[in-house]
């Protein structure tokens, strides 16, 4: 099945019908209503979940990992329910990573699977809803390592900017007597067709041997190269591997201040304070090294991080695991869900925190403080929870989330019925053309009168999870969108004008790379020549075209003027980026003859004089009839001599 790319808006219209009496609470567990029963009975540290839309119909689907049996995915039936589909992968151990993306760039999403033992592979999507195990996933063919070593999560990003997704795998091993290469984190370069090259040692990303739980790709310094972040348990500091652009990486976490040593359980990235810089949230246990409690690393304009959890009332001293940033109340700032499970004290209480903007009346400055939502929003639910992922499952404009547990607790599907506060939202997905199709690594920003909100697109994040690729941006009380900006992994920066693309609150859109409409300033050109004589001209020097987008000049792009050889057709000017046509406009050209230029060579000269003399006395239709009286006479000769020496364009 080919992707369905939606460029026009449509209103959220399909809403799940709930039984009477269930709407008293904002979030309602709909797993029973959807007839979805999923356990992770013998789970160790949790199993992966994903809300990726693998059939590309615009509705997030659900896929759960477990410790045994076939992987099951639930296909979203347009918000009315889910259809369970078993996949051809029999689990031999707890599944840590389930990640959907178009790994072979054929237009449909495939599935990557990683088990805790290190067993991993791909399920290829045939485009019609069927899947088959990729057979070349044994080490030596695709270079996917099958080492029997304890593994954590995984993530995909484009390390070399070639448009396909490369793979990072976390290993959960730190003992010195197990220092074989197979026990270190792995970096695999995608060579196409589900074939990978192991570049771990060459890249320098294997310098540490730690208890790595999760990785994430993010161009943190915005130099055009996707970097790799890794969180570690126990004694190993977290890492931030800067991509040097030549296939190698260097850990700069000690320089930037993100090398904290805790029992880091989640790698959750989000701009919680709306300053344009992405921040990091890490959960922790009671035994963390650099102080107890969760950690909030706030990124500053200079690229450095500072730990400020206490300043924002989010130093949570509990045994916590996965977390997810999401704007559940659509007020333009990110709220936070945190999953809890203490093996020594089971049945923990998960947390849903509201991000509140508080103003200091004395100074006029504002700060963001987190406070737990009341039970009217999210009720008490004592679970052994590990993994969370979010997305708008029923597309009602309010983000939902799914929690995966261990033991005898089945997964929760928390549906957001809305806060009744009048707030709106807009949902946007991306599709790459020059960039990887999933736009992994892209920076998506929505500007409205109240806020500018930026999100980074990931394939693998938080803890063992993959969020929906459709980002829900709360707009508060704003009734319009000012603009949408996309920084694509290819390096292209596009500005999408809401009026031109009909972007509005309450809408759902998928923006395709290269589809932004651009404006062009030009003047109608007048040429004293004929189309037949300029048809071979490349256009250079004839027109002065300035391409602009949202008032910003586009630089470094390729201008390609082309002549349309159809009679009387205008010039076509196009703007391209790496062979992708971004914009096109036509320029009207008014051709007029140069008086006396009878041979149309652009100059009135002796050759034209001979033609006038030859036609003296001609009556009717005559080329030398310059006064249009149907006769070539001395009057025409005098008119010709008045133009003698003229040249086209002068």
Features from the language model and the residues they span:
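Blade-edge motifs of beta-propeller repeat domains
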Residues: 24-44, 75-93, 124-149, 186-210, ...
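Gly/Ser/Thr/Pro-enriched helix-cap/hinge segments flanking short amphipathic alpha-helices
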Residues: 34, 38, 304, 359, ...
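Beta-propeller blade termini
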Residues: 45-56, 75, 95-105, 124, ...
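Cellulosome-associated attachment modules in secreted, modular CAZymes
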Residues: 49, 583, 588-650
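Acidic carboxylate motifs that coordinate Ca2+ or other divalent cations, activating on Asp/Glu
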Residues: 57, 61, 106, 110, ...
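Hydrophobic beta-strand segments that make up the repeating blades of beta-propeller
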Residues: 59-66, 111-115, 167-171, 228-232, ...
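Solvent-exposed segments in extracellular or luminal domains encompassing
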Residues: 559-570
């Amino acid at each position: 099945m080919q992707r369905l790319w939606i460029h026009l808006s449509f209103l959220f219209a399909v809403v799940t019908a709930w039984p009477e009496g269930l709407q008293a609470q904002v979030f309602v567990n709909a797993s029973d209503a959807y007839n979805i029963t999923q356990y992770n009975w013998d789970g160790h540290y949790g199993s992966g979940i994903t809300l990726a839309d693998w059939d590309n119909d615009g509705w997030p689907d659900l896929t759960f990992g477990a410790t045994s049996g076939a992987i099951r995915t639930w296909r979203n039936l347009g918000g009315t329910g889910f259809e369970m589909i078993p996949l051809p992968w029999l689990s031999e151990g707890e599944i840590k990573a389930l990640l959907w993306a178009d790994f072979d760039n054929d237009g449909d999403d495939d599935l990557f699977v990683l088990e805790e033992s290190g067993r991993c592979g791909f399920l290829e999507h045939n485009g019609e809803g069927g899947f088959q195990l990729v057979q070349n996933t044994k080490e030596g063919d695709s270079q996917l390592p099958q080492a029997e070593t304890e593994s954590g999560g995984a993530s995909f990003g484009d390390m070399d900017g070639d448009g396909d997704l490369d793979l990072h795998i976390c290993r959960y091993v730190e003992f010195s007597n197990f220092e074989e290469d197979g026990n270190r984190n792995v970096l695999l370069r995608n060579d196409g067709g589900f074939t990978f090259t192991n570049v771990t040692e060459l890249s320098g990303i294997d310098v540490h041997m730690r208890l790595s739980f999760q990785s994430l790709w993010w161009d943190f310094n915005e130099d055009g190269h996707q970097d790799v972040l890794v969180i570690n348990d126990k004694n190993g500091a977290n890492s931030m591997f800067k991509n040097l652009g030549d296939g190698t990486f260097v850990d700069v976490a000690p320089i930037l201040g993100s090398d904290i040593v805790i029992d880091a359980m989640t790698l959750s990235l989000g701009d919680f304070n709306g300053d344009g810089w992405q921040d990091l949230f890490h959960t922790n246990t009671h035994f963390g090294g650099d102080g107890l409690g969760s950690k909030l690393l706030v990124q500053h304009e200079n690229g450095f991080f500072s730990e400020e959890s206490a300043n924002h009332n989010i130093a949570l001293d509990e045994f916590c695991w996965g977390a997810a940033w999401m704007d559940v109340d659509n007020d333009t700032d990110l709220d936070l869900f945190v999953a809890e499970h203490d093996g020594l004290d089971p049945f923990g209480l998960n947390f849903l925190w509201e991000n509140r903007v508080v103003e200091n009346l004395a100074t006029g400055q504002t700060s963001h403080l987190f406070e737990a939502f009341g039970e009217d929003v999210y009720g008490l639910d004592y679970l052994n929870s590990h993994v969370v992922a979010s997305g708008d499952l029923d597309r009602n404009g309010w983000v939902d989330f799914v929690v995966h547990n261990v033991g005898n607790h089945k997964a929760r599907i928390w549906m957001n019925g809305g806060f009744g506060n009048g707030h709106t939202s807009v949902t946007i997905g991306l599709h790459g053309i020059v960039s990887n199709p999933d736009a992994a690594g892209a920076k998506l920003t929505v500007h409205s009168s109240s806020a500018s909100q930026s999100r980074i697109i990931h394939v693998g994040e938080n803890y063992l999870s993959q969020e929906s690729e459709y980002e829900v941006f709360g707009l508060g009380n704003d009734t319009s969108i000012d603009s949408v900006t996309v920084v694509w992994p290819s390096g292209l920066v596009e500005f999408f004008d809401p009026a031109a693309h009909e972007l509005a609150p309450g809408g759902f859109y998928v923006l395709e790379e290269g589809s932004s409409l651009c404006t062009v300033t030009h003047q109608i050109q007048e040429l004293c020549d004929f189309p037949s004589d300029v048809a071979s001209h490349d256009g250079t020097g004839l027109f002065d075209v300035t391409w602009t987008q949202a008032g910003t000049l586009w630089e470094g792009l390729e201008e390609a003027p082309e002549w349309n050889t159809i009679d009387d057709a205008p010039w076509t000017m196009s703007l391209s980026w790496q062979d992708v046509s971004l914009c096109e406009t036509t320029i009207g050209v008014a051709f007029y003859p140069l008086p006396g230029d009878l041979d149309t060579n652009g100059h009135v000269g002796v050759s034209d004089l001979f033609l006038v003399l030859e036609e003296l006395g001609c009556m009717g239709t005559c080329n030398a009839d310059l006064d249009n009286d149907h006769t070539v006479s001395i009057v025409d000769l005098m008119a010709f001599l008045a133009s003698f020496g003229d040249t086209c364009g002068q």
